[in-house]
């Protein structure tokens, strides 16, 4: 057993195998440690996240002598999944395993599978043969698909799983099922839970899909306040997200710049975690009734009926007035809070839109009516400052510094690459989004980061701030909508306090990493 720090608020516990991972996960889920937020199991590791650095440090000391009690002896639940074996990769997978097509299907259906852990996407559960002697090791596709259909049944390595919704993927596809793997309103929402037994049954046809909407959403009551005239490039509903659901494959999500969102809410008298609008590229709103708003985040001009107003200040907007937030001069995301607290459809208790999984409400559109909760609010606060922590460079581009702790997989890289990672100026590429910042060296003459070892890393838990390095050697800084698990080594982890900085770095921005003590 080895414990790796992950930033300052998480630990990656490396264990001897899947059975030990499942035992630890069961024990620490049943009896969480102090301030423990999440426990994310993977093939050989368990990621534990905490609310504070002190709690993570205390947990690391406690776990050095931790021995989970015997696992539950309850009869496992059996989940049966009907599969039409019409997958695009059946023949290729059979060839890779030295089987016939019929032999592969027989192996897949006659094997009893153990649900080991969730990850990748809501409802995606990694299953391994309950009898280890029936295991195989099949490689992923050399070129992943950009879109795997919902209900696709795949295998990779020693695992089998069902894709619950359309998503990218590199597994070998054997067939299709219409069995819904995820229903947000169900308890539990994922059909297959860790510890369950799974059997696949070959069928000649499948029933129609009952619902084309894989995720259920609840619509609370609301009072109309603003009409969207122009949502800009993209405007999303965001709040504090869905922490603590990583075992379901659900990432925390939430406002990309949480300090800016909280400041806007406090300014208008809302709770810090109330829902706000998160905007890129400017937005134009019309007031339907008298209300109070506040804009924070990126440096941008805000106009009320063509008169400029200050960022981070509560502003009275009378019925019929127009509010314009112009595109940012530097920074990236603007946040708009409305007194009372914006109301949007909720899923798993949150109105946050997760762009990777598809959880949460759709992006805001022209003509949408923005409503608020029918409740009283606290006093407004006009003494706040905008918490933007990026700066404007000499050529007008945004720049920032991200504090980080090396690891947990810094030993996968050469010393020269570790030095280069910290010394270089990196540039944010246009392929960046709420999932992560994709970086490239600001100087074309600089070589990609190099690994010190061969092979691939088994998928393991990720956090916002994980800096993955794919085979290209160009880092990716995970943001709020990151995948729950990932398979590339993490060279460093950005401090939780600096994720807000990363969220305000647009394409073309430059960034440096600054090493701090863990």
Predicted regions and their residues:
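Conserved "landmark" site that anchors the functional core of diverse proteins
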Residues: 1-518
